[in-house]
């Protein structure tokens, strides 16, 4: 994923990413990529990896599904990783000379699913330091209250929050502690204190995406239940300054 000079991102978009912790990018991905990723998810569901899981605890109800680290076994995902414009976009946003892949995954929330995404930030799930960003690419047209919301500016709080499990109930993993010199705190109760925060959320058409800092808190803000199945593909990538 070596950097290729381009003009995919404007100065204003870079400034928003740095200041807000998330930026909406309009029509950056051709529809062919959306269709390939949807086919990849279908292929993965038929032959899932050992990491495939449902975050829905009740049986026989609409589910919230996920699989990850499958880019090297699902050809559609591998093609996206190597040939889509995301590496260029990410390198421009982070002023990177080189982009390294950290993790790929996808989520699928079936129509009628009551399961949702807890508020969390991705950095806590990885033992890494450096500059990293995440692609959030919806594979269906998604209203701003159907997708994820981001807490504006939360990447600049200089805080690390404990992991939150995606499984229904959203249990916090572990207790407040200092680990390897880093302080991990309980995540804030965003849902019960919405008035304290400013949120970023967007209506997304096919080809639109959101890219956000690994430290930015995000999750499902609305209690609405989707009336259609919604899926999204994500990629986490790191600048050359990142270390494990």
At which residue positions do the language-model features occur?
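Short, structured patches in soluble enzyme cores that scaffold and shape functional sites
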Residues: 105, 121, 137-141, 150-152
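A short beta-loop-beta micro-motif enriched in histidine and acidic residues
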Residues: 120-132, 197, 204, 228-230
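Double-stranded beta-helix
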Residues: 144-217
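A short secondary-structure junction signal
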Residues: 113, 117-121, 130, 145-151, ...
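Non-heme Fe(II)-dependent double-stranded beta-helix
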Residues: 2-20, 26-119, 125-126
């Amino acid at each position: 994923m070596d950097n290729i000079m381009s003009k995919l991102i404007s100065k204003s978009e870079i400034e928003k990413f740095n200041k807000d912790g998330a930026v909406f990018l309009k029509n950056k991905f051709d529809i062919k990529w959306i269709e390939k990723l949807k086919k990849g998810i279908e292929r993965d569901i038929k032959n899932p990896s050992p990491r495939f899981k449902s975050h829905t605890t009740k049986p026989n109800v609409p589910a919230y599904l996920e699989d990850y680290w499958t880019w090297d076994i699902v050809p559609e995902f591998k093609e996206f990783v190597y040939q889509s414009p995301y590496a260029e976009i990410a390198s421009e946003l982070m002023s990177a000379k080189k982009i390294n892949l950290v993790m790929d995954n996808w989520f699928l929330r079936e129509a009628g699913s009551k399961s949702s995404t807890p508020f969390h930030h991705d950095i806590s799930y990885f033992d890494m330091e450096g500059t990293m960003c995440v692609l959030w690419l919806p594979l269906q047209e998604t209203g701003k209250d159907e997708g994820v919301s981001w807490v504006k500016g939360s990447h600049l709080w200089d805080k690390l929050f404990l992991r939150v499990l995606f499984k229904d109930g959203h249990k916090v993993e572990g207790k407040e502690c200092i680990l390897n010199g880093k302080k991990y705190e309980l995540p804030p109760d965003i849902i019960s204190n919405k008035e304290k925060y400013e949120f970023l959320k967007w209506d997304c058409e096919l080809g639109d995406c959101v890219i956000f800092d690994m430290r930015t808190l995000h999750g499902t803000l609305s209690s609405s239940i989707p009336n259609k199945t919604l899926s999204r593909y994500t990629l986490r990538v790191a600048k050359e300054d990142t270390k494990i």
